[in-house]
Amino acid sequence: GDLKRLLADAAEKSKADFMLINPIHAGAPIPPLEPSPYLPESRRFLNVTYIRPQDIPEYATLPADVRAQVDALHDSVAARNDESTPMDINAAWEAKRPALRLIFEAGRNNKRELEFEHFKTTAGPDLDSFATWCLCFEVWGAPWGENRWFFEKTIDDPAVRQLVEEHHDLFEFNRWLQWIAAEQVNAAQQEALDHGMTLGLMQDMAVGVHGLGADAWANPERFASGGVTVGCPPDFYNQQGQDWGQPPFNPRYLEATGYQVYREMVHSMYEHAGAVRIDHVLGLFRLWWIPQGLGARNGAYVT
């Protein structure tokens, strides 16, 4: 929606060949949301807060009373778009998410349902894992609070499987949100190309993910164990060094699997963009690993 118009305006007014945006990786399902786009819960999926409900095909066919509810939720926060103060993403999402839930519950025609099923099949088990993490987050609470489910339960835990069965509608809603987000980012990219951009959207890949996020929980074997995080050594910018609090990929796992998880992540980003900027691109060759509790100054480069 808004991204689509932004790209079209940029193409017409600046004659630019591309527009670089901040990372649009997936965040938490409910507020409070992480304000930094460089600390996502998953780099494999999209940030659904960018969805524009009015651009979803089913919005146009909503029953009048349901559409009125969606519009009322929009109007409750729309005026803030014209204010000069920083946007309150939590307030916006608290209005947008129930509006999206109303559209989801209204259903789809057979053609659209088949498209949704195709998306789920193509996205594969990683989509199911992400939707499961979102469900656990919403029902059991944020994993960085007093809730211990992140550490005590794996994705194959019987309690997790039971939770998905009991709240399958919410599980399905989280998969649906990813489908809609992918459709709308694709539409934005096509809009940019149609208006003359050569590359269109340039996505930004964050250097890592939240240590308690979906990627780290669902597939711990992909990450280094022992509480290791990545950052950078002391320099003129920060003489103490920096600890970004993000677990690095396990290089042995990557090598043993032919870097499949990384290749799939890059491929998924190129599905919605003409180019990808890799934040801290030298991280492809080396990363500053920091042992838990020792501080950034006592880290070391791992290749």
What annotation goes with each model-predicted range?
Residues G1-N219, L254-E255:
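Acidic/aromatic-lined carbohydrate-recognition and catalytic surfaces
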Residues T198-V261, M265-S268, H272, R286-T303:
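Substrate-binding/active-site clefts of carbohydrate-active enzymes
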